[in-house]
Amino acid sequence: GYTPDEFWSIANRFGFENRMDGLLAYMYTMIEECRKKGIRLSRDYLVSCGRAIELFPGVSDWFSRINAFGETQGVEIEHYVLSSGLREIIEGSGVSHEFKEIYACEFFYNEQGLASWPKLDVNFTNKTQFVYRINKGILDVAKDKELNASMPDDSKRIPFTNMIYIGDGLSDVPCMKMMRAYGGQAVAVYQDSNRAGVEDLLAKGRVDFIFPADYRDGTLFDTTMKNIVRKMAIADALAEENQQQLRALGRGELPQQMGLLGW
């Protein structure tokens, strides 16, 4: 076998020498190196590798807690993964059932059940297409025509203003910038090893907030996420009231109201 550093050295060198997308390079390297060493690179094998993932504090019950909080605000919360890692490994992590959809790199498996080709590649910039998929409610990656078709804003399933993007590195920057540009919220979490880089994201206006990667109840991260959900719920209620009044005005049905006067 190889240490992680040795594997990435091989994959990165192969990608550089062949002017290849870095993620496709590492997926190809996995297939080739497993073939050379007689390792069955099957879906089950990769899923089993995911069982060794150590989750950040509080992640295991984060989803049920924030979902329950959303219900108190009249909000239904959905969770998605956009990752440059392997979908199969994420599926083995123990929390994959919490996600409505997982968008991550994935292999195609041949008749022998072995990985033979990259099925999906989620790199730095094409992560944004999956945000659009969530926005429009077109989750099937094979439906490119439907994704690119024009859709009125009021027909889009999840407005950008109702999205929170949580990331931890440079591969998330395009989506973070997209969130901020379209009225959503961008949040970065950090460990000691990447704190400086995450602080730079905040300093350069690429994210709204940064927090230690601690999802436990009562942490500043947890409290801020709840405040953002509250804000989104209030904004939706105000927007709906505005639309109701406009519709009533068009029908000549707007009731007499006492308003606040500015002076």
What are the roles of these predicted feature ranges?
Residues 91-93, 113-115, 175-178:
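A short secondary-structure junction signal
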Residues 116-136, 231-238:
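A polyampholytic, Gly/Pro-enriched intrinsically disordered region
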Residues 127-171:
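Conserved Lys-Pro-Asp/Glu-containing loop-to-beta segment of HAD-superfamily phosphomonoesterases
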Residues 68-77, 156-161, 181-183:
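Short, surface-exposed connector motifs at secondary-structure boundaries
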Residues 13, 158-263:
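Mg2+-dependent phosphoryl-transfer enzymes with acidic/Ser/Thr/Gly-rich catalytic loops
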Residues 59, 148-149, 172, 194:
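Amphipathic coiled-coil/heptad-repeat helices and related helical stalk/stem segments
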Residues 1-111, 205-207:
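Alpha-helical substrate-recognition element adjacent to the catalytic core
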